[in-house]
């Protein structure tokens, strides 16, 4: 039977064409794809034990609830996956909801939002006893012990308990329950260590205030994630380097490149932008609270930044100042003219120890580091990176304000016990782009990647070279699309002949 061409056939052809076009490879897409994230959590009976004693103000308790919600968001919640219970405590213990109560993430999050503080004393031992003997029991929804099901308790507290936690914690650990202890503010750190499982550096966390407790959420999201290495399996879209983390990955670039805003592709870094000069000075806290092993990680962090700079007399210069109770200039701007020499000097830097005089160090930066006599160049962008792990023992506000008033681009990097208010005082505007915090020295390399993007200014998108590159890219995409359309047209012609 002969089928003639007509409106119906034209409509059919158009639909076929659209279906085939939908199969055009993703590589032709002009829209950046999001960074990879895939996480499956192993089946877990998880109980939060949350201190809401009178020392925890209502606004601070709200921040705890945000932290809890962020951790829950990352879990596979369900009767056969992760079950979550919550125990609220002060002088008494109040079970907010048992493990069996909520089979979905949405209902769990609603239950967390409804929790109110109790506002009396601090009976942490009593709360732990309840969590272990009641909250994880069969009657409350706890499952039978099995190698396939984890039993986890996370304690959040900000004070010294009015009872003992040692014995009950030992019994819990002996029975196979994994204990995490999170301390806030003036918490008794010895108590945290008595509660937590080994290794303690993975099970004890401390933050200066409730304002930064949310920053711990990522750690717990990764702790519960058991998905395979996405970089090793090739399930990523990074142009150069893939850096794996549990259930996720981030893209990185080779030495001399910086990551673009799409989080996947890389550009050559030119120190303060193509053809511009940057004077960059690191102001590094070498106080005793840092500890020698962490100071070595700080040195690696510095060299990670140096690796991305185009070091030369015309472009990027680097200086380094270490401070504690006193200030020591390790090397001024312009002393070293190659990355290799700068990195060697950083590796050879010795650890000062003693106190934390951040205010005096900032004043030194202003009065000495960015002067012509110390190698600074008139007209060059002035960038200061302040790295600290604790509260300053002197006043920082005046010096921090003056540095920004002079036009210095100031970045503040805090680790562990660093005080958020001080970091924000140091950071340039917008503060969100110039202030960085992590709870653990082991993760400062992630801050390094973010800093690289801020220091390395993108070239002018309207510059002639950029326009030519864009035009060439678009032309290539159009040619590829044209070839695809020609192939589709050929297939349609063959199909039409067969039908006829």
From Swiss-Prot:
Gene3D superfamilies, alphabetized: 1.20.5.30, Laminin, von Willebrand factor, type A domain
**Glycosylation sites (chain numbering):** 80, 348
- Which keywords describe this protein according to UniProt? Coiled coil, Disulfide bond, EGF-like domain, Extracellular matrix, Glycoprotein, Repeat, Secreted, Signal
Which tissues express it?
Expressed in femoral head articular cartilage. Expressed in the trachea and extraskeletal tissue around the eye.
Protein's GO biological process: chondrocyte differentiation; extracellular matrix organization; growth plate cartilage chondrocyte morphogenesis; regulation of bone mineralization
Please state every residue range assigned to the domain named EGF-like: 227-267
Domain VWFA, which positions?
30-226, 268-457
Q: Main location per UniProt?
A: secreted
Which segments does the entry list as coiled coil? 471-499
Question: What happens to this protein after translation, modification-wise?
Answer: N-glycosylated; reduces binding affinity for type 2 collagens.
Q: Which pairs are disulfide-linked?
A: 231-242, 238-251, 253-266
Instruction: Name its cellular compartments.
Output: Secreted, Extracellular space, Extracellular matrix
Domain of life according to the entry: Eukaryota
Q: What PANTHER family does its record include?
A: CARTILAGE MATRIX PROTEIN, COLLAGEN ALPHA
Q: What is this protein identified as?
A: Matrilin-1
């Amino acid at each position: 039977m002969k089928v003639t061409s007509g409106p119906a056939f034209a409509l059919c052809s158009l639909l076929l064409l659209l279906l085939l076009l939908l199969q055009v490879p993703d590589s032709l897409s002009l829209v950046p794809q999001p960074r990879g994230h895939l996480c499956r959590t192993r089946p877990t009976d998880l109980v939060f034990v949350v201190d809401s004693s009178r020392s925890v103000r209502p606004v601070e308790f709200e921040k705890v609830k945000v932290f809890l919600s962020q951790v829950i968001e990352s879990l596979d919640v369900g009767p056969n996956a992760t079950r979550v219970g919550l125990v609220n405590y002060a002088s008494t213990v109040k079970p907010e909801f048992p493990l069996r109560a909520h089979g979905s993430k949405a209902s769990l999050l609603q239950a967390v939002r409804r929790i109110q503080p109790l506002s009396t004393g601090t009976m942490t031992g009593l709360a732990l006893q309840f969590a272990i003997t009641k909250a994880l029991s069969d009657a409350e929804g706890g499952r039978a012990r099995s190698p396939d099901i984890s039993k986890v308790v996370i304690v959040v507290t900000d004070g010294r308990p009015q009872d003992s936690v040692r014995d009950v914690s030992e019994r819990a650990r002996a029975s196979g329950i994994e204990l995490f202890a999170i301390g806030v503010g003036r918490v008794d750190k010895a108590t945290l260590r008595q509660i937590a499982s080994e290794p303690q550096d993975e099970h004890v966390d401390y933050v200066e205030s409730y304002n930064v407790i949310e920053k711990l959420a990522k750690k717990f999201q990764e702790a519960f994630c058991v998905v395979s290495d996405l970089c090793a399996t090739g399930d990523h879209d990074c142009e150069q380097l893939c850096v794996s983390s549990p259930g996720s990955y981030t893209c990185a670039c080779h030495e001399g490149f910086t990551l673009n805003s799409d989080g996947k592709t890389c550009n050559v870094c030119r120190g303060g932008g193509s053809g511009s000069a940057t004077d960059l000075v690191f102001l590094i806290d070498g106080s005793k609270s840092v500890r020698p092993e962490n100071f070595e990680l700080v040195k690696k962090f510095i060299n990670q930044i140096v690796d991305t700079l185009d070091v030369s007399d015309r472009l990027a210069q680097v200086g380094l100042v270490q401070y504690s109770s006193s200030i020591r200039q390790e090397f001024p701007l312009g002393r070293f003219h190659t990355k290799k020499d700068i990195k060697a000097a950083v590796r050879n830097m010795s650890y000062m120890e003693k106190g934390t005089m951040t205010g005096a160090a900032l004043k030194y930066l202003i009065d000495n580091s960015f002067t012509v006599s110390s190698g600074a160049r008139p007209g060059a962008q002035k960038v200061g990176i302040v790295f600290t792990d604790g509260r300053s023992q002197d006043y920082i506000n005046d010096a921090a304000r003056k540095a920004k008033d002079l036009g210095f681009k100031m970045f503040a990097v805090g680790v562990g016990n660093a005080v958020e208010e001080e970091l924000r005082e140091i950071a340039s505007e917008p503060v969100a782009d110039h202030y960085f915090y992590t709870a653990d020295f082991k993760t400062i390399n992630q801050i390094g990647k973010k800093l690289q993007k801020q220091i390395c200014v993108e070239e002018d998108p309207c510059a002639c070279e950029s326009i030519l590159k864009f035009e060439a890219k678009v032309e290539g995409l159009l040619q590829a699309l044209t070839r695809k359309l020609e192939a589709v047209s050929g297939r349609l012609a063959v199909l039409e002949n067969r039908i006829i």
